[in-house]
């Protein structure tokens, strides 16, 4: 790809595809904002209270319309923020342009950027000398710890959005290299129950359909992994008429999948049966040579985990006599036997490579968690030991309350009698 040179707009540095795309980006950011009432209320409060005044912040996220609303809220709160992409294929170039042109937020992200550019953008962001990091997959946090040790003393904390990133943070903590607090946004109830399940389920199928235009009814879809993302993907595939097989390594989750009505088997048994394969595990080489060898001619494989490692594309490429693009985000690998296997989105997140990511309504809660986690870190600066912290229950519940309010839904509350009963141990049979 051609790398766009770093440009300056009234001393604002940025690296995006085309700033003239800003009007389209603004329209779409505002449209997304209509479905994000919680982030809107947080932004309005931040604008008055300025909790991030004097704070330098890096946000490493998918550069989407929803992320834009988060970035705007953080800037309203006084943050000196820089935004970079957390995936080379997930950037929406018109959104990046709007954030630079209309909101003065430095963005370093181009859809389709190569790995060298992606990692250079991480370094540029770290040159901002952040106090707070919003991470999505852990790349910025890991790079800071490995290559920028002299900057660690300035870090108040980091927040992490993904299962993959939390796994990496736990490994950092185990190795004794995580020397500041990290907020586990991924495991907040108002995040994983909705973003991971309903968001991933809908957006993954959206990306697959946009990339291929295949009819899912009657197809056999193999979902690798039955965490919240896998549950959502399996549920939505079944809703579109697919016969769904689940593969798992966790016995409890496998039982859950069976009792939810899905067939469960090892990947080597599912491989000859599947028409479409979706990996949502967060692990490496879930689909590998022994699976490719027994797949049907024309089988489609894609990933909706975080990194492009779940499908062993290097091995598939070595087996292929020809690789050609047959549609946007759709590559056909022809093997020596004459059989073809179709890979979507270069094995990267199909929901962001070929579609627009999760719907705004679920990202509203996820990004509310990010914003309030950042505020929590600032309020508790110097009070938290290095480690991984869950989102406080009161913040989680407040986000849920605000979301219900935005949806026009009210719920019951405990009566004094019920509260007394729940706090008593003397009443029995």
UniProtKB/Swiss-Prot annotation:
GO cellular component annotations of the record: cytosol
Cofactor annotation comment: Binds 1 NAD(+) per subunit.
One Pfam family this sequence matches: AdoHcyase
Chain residues that bind NAD(+): 162-164, 196, 225-230, 248, 283, 304-306, 351
Metabolic or biological pathway, per its Swiss-Prot or TrEMBL entry: Amino-acid biosynthesis; L-homocysteine biosynthesis; L-homocysteine from S-adenosyl-L-homocysteine: step 1/1
Binding site for substrate: 64, 136, 161, 191, 195
UniProt-listed GO biological process terms: L-homocysteine biosynthetic process; one-carbon metabolic process; S-adenosylmethionine cycle
Chemical reaction(s) catalysed: S-adenosyl-L-homocysteine + H2O = L-homocysteine + adenosine
Reported cofactor(s): NAD(+)
GO function term, MF aspect, one: adenosylhomocysteinase activity
Enzyme Commission number(s) from the entry: 3.13.2.1
Compartments reported by the entry: Cytoplasm
Keywords in alphabetical order: Cytoplasm, Hydrolase, NAD, One-carbon metabolism
Family: Belongs to the adenosylhomocysteinase family.
Protein purpose: May play a key role in the regulation of the intracellular concentration of adenosylhomocysteine.
Protein name as it appears in the record: Adenosylhomocysteinase
Species assigned in the record: Gloeothece citriformis (strain PCC 7424) (Cyanothece sp. (strain PCC 7424))
Gene: ahcY
